[in-house]
């Protein structure tokens, strides 16, 4: 999914003969359900609620140590596998979905479109959601939604057959 090798230092490695890691996000196991699959029908929609593990704890600074970044946290992940022609439409609907949750919770939020320098190398377009924390007097990222286009599908060999029977990469 693009976590390795770039983010290896932020992951928890399990000691042993094989290179195993605790999951940094449910995106990793969820997308791997579709490794080497040829999709027959779109969209595929998944959600997962998992504990996640990252070494980035405390990266917000000592004034909020232990409040914003923890080594273990629970996270909800939404993943969609889509036809390339519909991937940006799907991204827009996922943005609306996350915004509707924040609206229901009546939380003040803003949506930021990340610039090229802030995107992960695997993402074509990402929107971050930030909620205002009155206690810290700052905006805190609470969600992000991305379109990876064919990046993850290429690594996963996640494909579909087009109208001519030719194998293509999903988004």
Give residue spans per PLM region.
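TRNA-recognition modules of translation machinery and tRNA-sensing kinases, especially anticodon-binding
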Residues: 1-171
């Amino acid at each position: 999914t693009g976590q390795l090798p770039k983010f290896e230092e932020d992951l928890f490695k399990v000691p042993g003969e094989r290179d195993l890691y605790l999951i940094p996000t449910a995106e990793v196991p969820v997308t791997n359900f579709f490794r080497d699959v040829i999709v027959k029908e779109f969209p595929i929609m998944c959600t997962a609620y998992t504990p996640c593990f990252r070494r980035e704890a405390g990266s917000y600074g000592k004034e909020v140590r232990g409040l914003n970044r923890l080594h273990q946290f629970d996270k909800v992940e939404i993943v969609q596998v889509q036809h390339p022609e519909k991937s940006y439409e799907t991204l827009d609907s996922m943005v609306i979905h996350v915004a509707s949750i924040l609206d229901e919770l009546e939380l003040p939020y803003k949506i930021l479109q990340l610039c090229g320098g802030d995107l992960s190398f695997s993402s074509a377009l990402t929107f971050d959601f930030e909620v205002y924390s009155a206690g810290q007097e700052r905006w805190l990222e609470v969600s992000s939604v991305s379109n990876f286009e064919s990046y993850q599908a290429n690594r996963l060999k996640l494909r579909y057959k087009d109208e001519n029977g030719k194998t293509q990469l999903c988004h």
